[in-house]
A protein has these predicted regions:
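Helical hairpin unit composed of two closely spaced alpha helices linked by a short loop
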Residues: 371-392, 397, 402
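Active-site donor-binding acidic/aromatic loop of nucleotide-activated sugar
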Residues: 423-427
Length: 514
């Protein structure tokens, strides 16, 4: 096993970057020490310090409003900085980057994607056959390096345990390589079963590349498990943005993707990680509802491209992707568009797709999400759909994994309920599935939550599926979950306790910052 780092040719640049990061960290640390000194020693009463911090806060806010980022995100930071200038400025420079990845880094990554991307002609047939479908495709392809594919099969898994069994079999059948990229890998039966099959395939000479997010896996991965992974033959491991003593603003930019690719022929993505709660092996927050999709055919190339993006960004190594050749003989029913999103792309394709799906709905709009913390623009789109007679239903958890975030989610019910939309809380437990289904024609499945963190900060992935049998299966799965859920009526929502209303109001101000 090789733990991948920068290549030798990049060593000098890496040393310089590390030195600069340490210097910046020391400056930020000095600001933080000064901040605590202000609190503990009460020297904020000094008039010149107050004037300095308030002027600094105003200058930071002016700079903030020059940035091309979400308006709600700007407003929350503005309130924080102007209310608490010293603390606000320190936290803003530490964590307030939004999609503000260094320009050179973003250009380098986007340049890499541009050289590897495939731009096909499949979308052109949609303009006459399905103009709304063409609009959805364009909302992604015009804002990213990903395009729509045909000659692709999808298989939807409403049961993640079944998906996991199928994925293990596909890995067992691997002949050349296996790529895995997950936000969370956690000690337990699920991860053990993956390691077991990787050990066998590594000994057979199959090349394995494995990415996992350090923060996502920090609390749930034992040292002995890491050592076991390290012992796998022919495996290269990349721990995405590992935590360190150096203060790193990129700590916000987590790799939230979930991808498996086998030999460039089979791919998986969805909401599930390599952890026992997703398959029901361990009970957390009641029944854990999630789903995933298996992709075969042309569109697997897009999943491979997403994986190679994070690998390139983290290691500096350019993966030798297979030359894309469309298999016209492959079966396939509809159109499939897997795509990646993240802070290196200021065009935000996931957000644009979500809004476009909302606009495209004529009969129904079904949304499944673990969190509902969205900006006014998206809320207005949902309201417009509901007021236009579209059957709008949104499924969220009843048993939360994060109580504070759940309170923010409930605070967003009112605007949608008043417009005629319906909200359901999944009574059996925690709804972690991220889906949008529209009119028996279009569906989204992936890792993107309806919250600021997913849409502004994380590296995410998703798949738009159109005119494919999986759309009907996703609809049926959604309605089955709704049948087990409690509908939250407007009357019930308005009758919640006063303190709950007050806390939701206060939380709404800081929601974009969380």
């Amino acid at each position: 096993m090789k733990i991948v780092g920068r290549r030798q040719s990049h060593l000098f640049a890496a040393v310089i970057k590390t030195a600069l990061a340490i210097i910046i960290s020391l400056v930020i640390l000095a600001l933080q020490i000064a901040f605590y000194a202000v609190l503990l020693l009460g020297i904020y009463n000094l008039w010149f310090l107050r004037i300095f911090t308030e002027v600094l806060g105003i200058l930071v806010v002016l700079g903030l409003y020059r940035r091309d980022i979400n308006s709600s995100y700007k407003l929350s930071w503005t309130i924080f900085i102007l209310a608490l200038p010293f603390a606000g400025v320190v936290f803003y420079f530490t964590f307030g980057g939004g999609r503000n990845v260094p320009k050179r880094k973003a250009e380098k990554i986007n340049g890499y994607l541009k050289t590897k991307a495939v731009s096909g002609e499949e979308h052109k047939g949609l303009y006459s056959a399905d103009p709304r479908g063409a609009m959805l495709v364009n909302s992604v392809r015009n804002n990213s390096f990903y395009d729509v594919y045909r000659h692709t099969n999808t298989e939807f898994f409403p049961d993640v345990a079944e998906k996991h069994r199928r994925m293990l079999k596909d890995i067992e059948d691997a002949k050349e390589y296996v790529y895995l990229e997950y936000f969370i890998i956690s000690d337990g039966k699920v991860l053990d079963s993956v390691i077991d099959v990787l050990e066998r395939k590594g000994k057979e000479g199959v090349k394995i590349k494995f990415i996992y997010d350090d923060i996502g896996s920090k609390k749930c991965l034992k040292r002995k498990t890491k050592k076991r992974i390290a012992a796998i033959e022919n495996l290269e491991l990349c721990v995405y943005e590992p935590m360190s003593l150096v203060i790193n603003p990129r700590i916000n930019y987590r790799d939230h993707r979930k991808i498996t690719v086998v030999d460039g022929k089979v791919g998986y993505t969805g909401g599930d990680n390599l952890a026992d709660e997703y398959t029901g092996e361990k009970i957390r927050f009641g029944h854990w509802r999630d789903n995933a999709v298996r992709i075969t055919g042309d569109a697997v190339y897009a999943l491979e491209l997403m994986f190679s993006e994070i690998w390139f960004m983290s290691t500096g190594e350019t993966l030798k992707l297979r030359d894309f050749v469309s298999d016209a003989s492959a079966s396939g029913f509809g159109y499939v568009l897997p795509f990646g999103d993240g802070p290196t792309n200021p065009l935000n394709p996931a957000y644009h797709l979500f809004e476009s799906l909302t606009v495209a709905a004529e009969k129904y709009l079904y949304i499944s999400t673990p969190y509902l913390i969205i900006d006014n623009s998206f809320i207005n789109m949902i309201q417009l759909a509901a007021k236009s007679g579209v059957d709008v239903r949104i499924l969220v958890p009843h048993i939360p994994d994060k109580k504070l975030i759940f309170a923010m989610t409930r605070g967003h019910y009112g605007d949608i309920l008043k417009a005629g939309g319906k909200i359901y809380e999944y009574t059996p437990g925690f709804n972690h599935a991220k889906n949008i289904i529209v009119d028996d024609k279009y569906a989204f499945i992936g890792t993107v939550n309806c919250d600021y963190r997913s849409m502004l900060l994380h590296f995410e992935c998703g798949t738009l599926i159109m005119h494919d049998p999986s759309v009907d299966k996703m609809r049926d799965d959604f309605l089955s979950a709704v049948a087990q859920s409690e509908e939250i009526t407007l009357e019930k929502w308005e009758n919640r306790p006063f303190l709950t209303k007050l806390s939701e109001l206060l939380l709404a101000v800081i929601a974009p910052l969380l």
